[in-house]
Amino acid sequence: MTDTTIAQLTARLEVLESEADIRRIQARYMFLCDTPCPEFGVDDDARRIELVLDLYTEDAVWEGVGEYYDGQFGRAEGKDAIRAHFNRFWGEKTDPALLLNAHYLTSEQIHVDGDTAEGQWIHMQPWLFSDGRSLLRSSRLNNAFRKVEGRWLISRTRTENVFVAPLPNHFAEAFPSSSVLLKP
């Protein structure tokens, strides 16, 4: 094998490894955002929020854009603002309580350019509330990632609503109040 071939293969491998790392970090974010939180041993939202923040760069941006999400989510710049965003979502729960939501990602596109990357997904998410009300939400994600000290992190989460549709009340008859899937 020539040095040129080895260099080309190395470059291709680096892109593939970067895509895999980005895919894992985006999936971990969605996993941590599920309710109930499936991460074993995470019993409170403050701990969950810190695990989510570990996925972000210090200067990251989290924003909801478009006519539906502008007013609902707005823009949070930096980890402290992102922490406040998640505290408003999980820490200030109102009645009815959110009992179940699960994030499903599809239509993935990841574009790596050295130590930066962008990824786009479509996301579907069923919600079930304690009063029986249920909905299905879909949004598009256009996220940015940056390699920091050899580790890929999220530098921007940008989400735009595709639709919100009601589901039949109590659409899920059986669901866990907590997750034990990852219990050792």
Report each predicted region and the residues it spans.
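Structural motif corresponding to the C-terminal cap of alpha-helices
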Residues: 33, 37, 90-94, 127
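A solvent-exposed, acidic/Ser-Thr-rich amphipathic alpha-helical stretch
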Residues: 46-121
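Short beta-strand segments enriched in hydrophobic/aromatic residues
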Residues: 33, 56-57, 64, 123-125, ...
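Generic detection of long, well-ordered alpha-helical segments
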Residues: 19, 42, 76-79, 135
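A beta-strand edge to alpha-helix "cap/lid" segment located at domain peripheries
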Residues: 3-10, 95-184
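Short, low-complexity N-terminal intrinsically disordered segments enriched in polar/charged residues
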Residues: 1-54
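A generic structural signal for short coil/turn motifs at secondary-structure boundaries
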Residues: 39-41, 70-72, 128-132
